[in-house]
Amino acid sequence: MTGTLPTQFKDSDLSPLTRPNALGRFGKYGGQYVPETLIPALIELEQAAKEAWKDSSFNSELNHLLKTYVGRSTPLYEATRLTEHYRKNTLKGPRIWLKREDLNHTGAHKINNALGQALLAIRMGKKRIIAETGAGQHGVATATVCARFGLECIIYMGKEDMRRQALNVFRMQLLGASVRPVTSGTATLKDATSEAIRDWVTNVETTHYILGSVAGPHPYPMLVRDFHAVIGEETKQQCKQAFGRSPDVLLACVGGGSNAMGLFHSFVEDKSVRMIGVEAAGDGVETGRHAATITEGRVGVLHGAMSLLLQDKDGQVEEAHSISAGLDYPGVGPEHSYLKEIGRAEYAAVTDTEAIEALQLVSKLEGIIPALETAHAFAYLEKLCPTLNHNSEIVINCSGRGDKDVNTVAEKLGSEI
């Protein structure tokens, strides 16, 4: 199964659980808090997306490229040794399955969205593409599809993230992208996003902004989710083939939240399926050096949308911290804030140390080196597994591979490469 028509455009009578309202809001979250100059571009983008999903030629091209270029569908893999590890003492605990988004072309889920938005940009006649990136995976995916379609590509990346993710910086440059360092603030993802938005305001007539997460102004949270919904659609079918029913638990890391929403979306209305997002607790939530936005955040506006944000007592957005560049963000997608508020999804946070330990464990037990972002989801198994019985089935979104993080992990462990 690849790239089927997203639920968003199949039925005008969908419940509020599966789509934003006419104002682009999930409950009170979302909206369009942007300069007037961007409103026409956002309207154009939403209209182009609606028309594209109804166009059989667009769907055919997207599905063909998802299959032959990206490599979908990605497998659902039974992690038998990881399952045994958590069952060894108590003989209870879930059977663990991995949705292998790390096997996509470019090594992460990000290309699902980058490919779809590139096709929309071409449809709108936009030949200049900009994007923000933290861990570099969205930047690499965007540079990849721009190379595929012959589009100009500019990537904004915080200087600190460029240091942490030097391999991905070179990959982007090798693919023909111009990588522009951002030195403001903490020189990480929030600052790169702000710089990309400034570029877009200036060049809105000729430029499409391929936003990399389910954040930002409407229609981006909906659009990015819908391009990633293939993850959950495939998972639902694969689970039925593997064990005859839907899983009991879905587990995914959450920064902005695109990989999690891609997995969750097809299951949102099935209340029998628990959905758990795992944020970055950094040095520990109690230290103030973390990126646990849903756990510790308050309602505010950042990058064009109302959502939960890390803020100080005066309402100023605080700096986030995580060893994972892809989770190092003080906001979260508005749909996640909504799902948390209505009690449909659960959210937890794990520390840098816990994520590093989980990365090592999964590598040694399954021969799969997950990205540091993904390792946060794996780390939560330590707390989750003892609470589940042996008949439970859990699916973890293995959102990316860890090649890009080897230097960071080695440095953290005191090893030299």
Swiss-Prot record:
Which species is the source of this protein? Prochlorococcus marinus (strain NATL1A)
GO CC terms of this entry: cytoplasm
Q: Which transformation does this protein catalyse, written as a reaction?
A: (1S,2R)-1-C-(indol-3-yl)glycerol 3-phosphate + L-serine = D-glyceraldehyde 3-phosphate + L-tryptophan + H2O
Which cofactors, by name?
pyridoxal 5'-phosphate
Residues that the record marks as modified (N6-(pyridoxal phosphate)lysine) are K110
Task: List, alphabetically, the CDD domains matched.
Answer: Trp-synth_B
Task: Name the job this protein performs.
Answer: The beta subunit is responsible for the synthesis of L-tryptophan from indole and L-serine.
Q: Which GO terms describe its molecular function?
A: tryptophan synthase activity
Superkingdom of the source species: Bacteria
Looking up SUPFAM superfamilies in the UniProt record yields: Tryptophan synthase beta subunit-like PLP-dependent enzymes
Official protein name in the record:
Tryptophan synthase beta chain
Pathway per the UniProt entry: Amino-acid biosynthesis; L-tryptophan biosynthesis; L-tryptophan from chorismate: step 5/5
Family according to the record: Belongs to the TrpB family.
Q: What is its EC number?
A: 4.2.1.20
